[in-house]
């Protein structure tokens, strides 16, 4: 499967095009929500630049510090990246972790809103559905890179993986679960839920609640999907991403309950 095309002296990868498309689609959705809340939509496009920078840096660092077993087998360990600066910043072939992207984006958003006198919590709400949409689109970059596929399967929606992209021990297996597709669909459902909650029950939510819902829904889906993942990052024998998202989901649920404890008590 081709993973890009030649444009003069430059090889353009579909992975990068799709990631940028996801960012722009997310920006469009966030701009609509900002306008609905009577903010200047141009704020979103100015902010988006910083979110992309923060997200990419965070995503790369997450990958560097939680390398997958296949990356480690190829010698691309944390120490390798830290001692090879060019490889550290080379993301043309992937190597980005969504948990790190979210963390990096949150940090960038915090400093941007603080600098411009905006309500950080409210802007996390504005950004949440857009983030889910961006993830849903961005996951298709994994399709062209032939990565983030699940266990072997013969289900009708199985995907073929070229031999050079199959993991060690699975060389004879040709068809796999399209794990990227499952996560993309989950992200779309998350986006739809967040938009519905904002429009239907917006007056009941406090600033930051919608983002907390995002931090519950996405991690729950990611937690269960990771059981199908063949090349999950390990730290001390523990699935790093699965453990992290489980902790985030629990803490976010507790935070949401705590913020509405008085209403819950009255009911």
Give, region by region, the residue ranges found by the protein language model.
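Hydrophobic, membrane-interfacing alpha helices
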Residues: 1-267
